[in-house]
Amino acid sequence: MKGTIVLYPAMGRGHIVPMVELGKFLSTHHHATLSVKILLPSPPNSTTLRYITAVSAATPSITFLHLSPSQHLLRVLQTLISQSSKPKAFILDFFNHSAADVTQTLNIPTYYYFPNAASCVALMLYTPTIHHNTKNGNSSYNDTLRRIPGLPPLSPEDMPAPLLDRRSFESFANMSIQMRKSDGIIVNTFEKLENKAFLALKNGTCVSETSRSHSSTPETRKPRIFCVGPLVSNGGGEHDNDDSGCMSWLDLQPSRTVVFLSFGSYGRFSKSQIREIALGLERSGQRFLWVVRDPYERSELSLEELLPKGFLERTKERGMVVKNWAPQVKVLSHDSVGGFVTHCGWNSVLEAVSWGVPMVAWPLYAEQRLNRVVMVEEMKVALPLKEVDEDGFVRASELEERVRELMDSERGRGKEVRKRVLGATNDAVAALSDGGSSRIELNDLVGLWMQ
């Protein structure tokens, strides 16, 4: 009889897709022993729904259960148990941490899944130590950020906004303690991509300081870590009819000559910043494909209203601008794309690494500033953009210089990041191949469930 594994992603494409990709991998490689069920928060947006529909058709062994807001998780799990048997494991997104109370009540082995960098997990696990040291006056907040195990020295500006607020920080520290009590933490990364953070997680140095300053309890134990990535979408469920024409346009461009600019589902700029980006691209002289979303001041503006007068006409021979959305995986995997200006969302980073595309790092929100530090200083697969103020405004001249530098594959930093990302691509393929580090971790995980 197959063992049932239940996956519970948080809302949002950036959380649903990597969780579903984990389910796909488990179902594909362990179909004889595992039955995978995914609880979906309802309702997903149209883009995510297309993706889920495509996965469901291609991998019918996965069962998708759509949760309505009124459904209680306890009743859903009790129904699953009555229909078959108790799940072998329950894997939840860290944003759904309250679900652990339910799974522990039912005595179901519980794992947290991070669709984030190992560096972010290391920071998360270290938050109780930061809280303890700063609260007791052992060290300042700034000093503590410079010595987080597995991470390069950080500044407060590199931290996610909630970790700069005392009350929110305490909530994250408490969440970290709860995670340490779990059966394990699964991370969408691989050993060679983030080796220092990987070792810090595996060796438990992210929690060891807390353990030294407290008696040994479940709150201070080292959780088991499983790095299983890169688990990324293959583009299934993205538009096949090329409504915008961007894929047809890419077909006409020379190999590795186009820089792609896209900033995620929530990446919006002011109208003035959009115009600054346009000027930088025009002056760079590079071919480009740019996804423009409405500015946060107004919506439903045409490209002509958003962009500098005459920009589209002046750049039509070497550039294309599309409104709101492009099939990112298909774009990054296209032969003509040679660079990526990204908001540093972890899914986007893994997609670029998987397809060998070097990046310019332009973080906007959440943990993306932390990702930038790691991408630039540790992974060395991206160039940083300099911002002129605390709101993150970037001048046209800065974007112009970085895009030119990135697309110059013959010399300087552009050549170096291209070399590094191509090496990371090979490492990514190896990690998920038979005998690779991530494949071994996944097999070990399944072995634990089926004992």
UniProtKB/Swiss-Prot annotation:
Substrates-to-products reaction catalysed: a 7-hydroxyisoflavone + UDP-alpha-D-glucose = a 7-hydroxyisoflavone 7-O-beta-D-glucoside + UDP + H(+)
Tissue occurrence: Expressed in roots. Detected in stems and leaves.
Keyword Glycosyltransferase: yes
Catalytic residue positions: H15 (proton acceptor), D93 (charge relay)
UniProt family annotation: Belongs to the UDP-glycosyltransferase family.
Purpose: Isoflavone 7-O-glucosyltransferase converting daidzein to daidzin, genistein to genistin and formononetin to ononin. Shows some activity toward the flavanones liquiritigenin and naringenin, but not toward cyanidin, isoliquiritigenin, apigenin, luteolin, kaempferol, quercetin, daidzin and puerarin.
Record's protein name: UDP-glycosyltransferase 13
Organism: Pueraria montana var. lobata (Kudzu vine)
Pfam families membership: UDPGT
